[in-house]
Amino acid sequence: MKTRLNQNGVGLIEVLVALLILAIGILGFVALQYRAIEATSEAINRVQAINIARDLAERIRANRDGLANYATQIQTAANQTNYTTNCMTSACSATAMADFDVSQVVSKASALGMTMNMRTCSGNSDGRNCIYVAWGDTSATDGTGAGDCTNGTAYLSTSTCVIMETY
């Protein structure tokens, strides 16, 4: 009887090591896909927020006489409810149009899970207003808290918001 000195085939240890390496590679790929999905979601939210801010800015541009009323209306949550007069189908004053515009834009933002605010921009001397649109755990405010959008003229690193400087 002749005995073999060399091993033939693949041992169980080699197979397990290969499976472990494959599993680590697959986990890396899954993590990469997850980050890509997060980045896509963030981009979609930013585009929607920019569109909402642009919508309000264009409405303000079209109704400059109601400028002071826009900030007042958007800063008061009770004023952001649906406005009873439809200024698209009937004549409205500049103030009523501002009320209507704010209710329309805030309604769009709320439908997307976003909050809005409008305040005088920090760091400028010409009285320009900034439109804040925030989503997620961020509020459309300026401050030093974890949920604030900005601190003065700088975005907070954990915030998810967009600011547009306007009239």
Predicted segments with their positions:
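N-terminal leader/signal peptides at the extreme start of proteins
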Residues: 1-10
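Mobile, glycine-rich extracellular loop/lid and propeptide segments
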Residues: 2, 19, 24, 58-61
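Amphipathic alpha-helical recognition patches that constitute DNA-binding helices
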Residues: 11, 48
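C-terminal juxtamembrane segment of a hydrophobic transmembrane alpha-helix
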Residues: 21-41
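Hydrophobic alpha-helical segments, especially transmembrane helices
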Residues: 34-36, 47, 55
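Flexible, low-complexity segments enriched in proline/glycine/serine and punctuated by aromatic residues
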Residues: 41-43, 50-167
